[in-house]
Amino acid sequence: MEEKITYKNAGVDTEKGREFIQKIKRNVESTHGPRVIGGLGGFAGAYDVSVLKKYKHPILLSGTDGVGTKIELARLLKIYNTIGIDLVAMCVNDILVCGGEPLFFLDYIACGKLDPEKMDQIVSGIVQGCKMSNASLLGGETAEHPGTMKEDEFDLAGFVVGAVEKDSMIDGSTIRSGDKILGLESSGPHSNGFSLIRKLLLKEGKYLPTDPQQVKFLKDYALKPTRIYVSSILKLLQQVSVKGMVHITGGGYQENVPRILPQGTQSKFFKEKIPSGYFFEKIKKDHKIEELELFATFNMGIGYMVIVSEENAELAKKIMESSGEVVHEIGEIVSGNKEEVQFV
């Protein structure tokens, strides 16, 4: 008997998709406050923007990002409950640089074949990240890509919308020579540099090492979720005038720090003040990589930077430490070409 032609036989199981939505519904809706109108499953997510009345002149901020090839490490290790935190962190930390308060978040998940248990773990991480950011998970899309992705492969993208008072928006324009750079410690490599990490730490860049200790190192240090700085920074902004901020992502220091600097200023970092930590020290020790290449690829122990005047540096440090951050004065602003980053 000839097989019946169906969408399911082509590789897309819509019934399993509906079951998945029901499975995650309660968890997702736990991020919803009174601002979210309606529940999960509609054609659009609805958000009550009357919250913007607290601003004199509200500016909306938006951001989108993914987690790169860190996903491949999560897939190999079969650990799926933290990669969603990474996804939220990469987005909310970016709009935070402008002083933005996250309002709502959306996600996109593409997979070769829908595995409800795996996807539930991924979404649970996204929910956790949203709660840490005080953002509502307003909606999302999960798409099966049979024939174009392997069954156990998946990819993630996130989208965030936030708000900031126009007069309080931070753009780096007031940064001057003599200002101090405060660095907030990262949890590890966060979500950047994983193509190099996989090349260095995986067999042929594709397979888990056979040594259990090396696998443990990957689990304990490389896969640790990206730190979310939202609550600490928003608390700081209420008390101290901040001139500029930097989220250290792809391209490390050399790509990210110049983005916030005005012409005629330059960042100068004191290498001995940067707490690279065990993960980066081991990478440096075990592999012959030039130090400047490490700073151009990784966060080297500092996930987020705050630039303040010299007179505000100590107070800003204390406020962030009171929020649980580990903070170091890692550099200063000097005169020079903004595109050149000094390490001394």
Curated annotation (Swiss-Prot):
Q: Per the UniProt entry, what are the Gene Ontology biological process annotations, in alphabetical order?
A: 'de novo' IMP biosynthetic process; adenine biosynthetic process; purine nucleotide biosynthetic process
- Protein keywords: ATP-binding, Cytoplasm, Ligase, Nucleotide-binding, Purine biosynthesis
**Which InterPro entries does the entry mention?**
PurM-like_C_dom, PurM-like_C_sf, PurM-like_N, PurM-like_N_sf, PurM_cligase
**Pfam families named in the record:** AIRS, AIRS_C
Q: Which pathway is this protein engaged in?
A: Purine metabolism; IMP biosynthesis via de novo pathway; 5-amino-1-(5-phospho-D-ribosyl)imidazole from N(2)-formyl-N(1)-(5-phospho-D-ribosyl)glycinamide: step 2/2
Q: What class of enzyme is it?
A: ligase
Which terms does the record give in the GO molecular function aspect? ATP binding; phosphoribosylamine-glycine ligase activity; phosphoribosylformylglycinamidine cyclo-ligase activity
Q: E.C. number, please?
A: 6.3.3.1
Q: Where in the cell is it found?
A: Cytoplasm
GO CC annotation terms, alphabetical: cytosol
Q: Which domain of life is it from?
A: Bacteria
Q: What is its main location?
A: cytoplasm
Q: Which reaction(s) are listed as its catalytic activity?
A: 2-formamido-N(1)-(5-O-phospho-beta-D-ribosyl)acetamidine + ATP = 5-amino-1-(5-phospho-beta-D-ribosyl)imidazole + ADP + phosphate + H(+)
The record's PANTHER family line, in alphabetical order, gives:
TRIFUNCTIONAL PURINE BIOSYNTHETIC PROTEIN ADENOSINE-3 (PTHR10520:SF12), TRIFUNCTIONAL PURINE BIOSYNTHETIC PROTEIN ADENOSINE-3-RELATED (PTHR10520)
Q: Which family does it belong to?
A: Belongs to the AIR synthase family.
Q: Per its UniProt record, what NCBIfam families does this chain match?
A: purM
* Name recorded for this polypeptide: Phosphoribosylformylglycinamidine cyclo-ligase
From which organism does this entry originate? Leptospira interrogans serogroup Icterohaemorrhagiae serovar Lai (strain 56601)
**Encoding gene per record:** purM
